Swiss-Prot record:
Highest taxon of source: Bacteria
InterPro entries (UniProt xref): Ribo_uL30_ferredoxin-like_sf, Ribosomal_uL30_bac-type, Ribosomal_uL30_ferredoxin-like
Molecular function GO labels: structural constituent of ribosome
Organism of provenance: Limosilactobacillus reuteri (strain DSM 20016) (Lactobacillus reuteri)
Name of the protein in its database record: Large ribosomal subunit protein uL30
Gene symbol of the encoding locus: rpmD
Record GO cellular component, one term: cytosolic large ribosomal subunit
Subunit (UniProt): Part of the 50S ribosomal subunit.
Signal peptide location: none
Classification lineage: Bacteria, Bacillati, Bacillota, Bacilli, Lactobacillales
Family: Belongs to the universal ribosomal protein uL30 family.
UniProt-listed Pfam families: Ribosomal_L30
Amino acid sequence: MAQVKVTLIHSVAHRQPTQRRTVKALGLGKINSSVILPDNAATRGQIFKIAHLVSVEEVK
């Protein structure tokens, strides 16, 4: 199964509470923190909600 590496590149300060909760649900905390997640519809949906805060790379 494919995986994606999600890295938080912008702060969640002054963001909507739903965006803050999504960042926390993905397992991201501080800026430049990264997490490897499965590439599925649920993960992609969460990433879409905070696309302006994160960078996404495919992991082989």
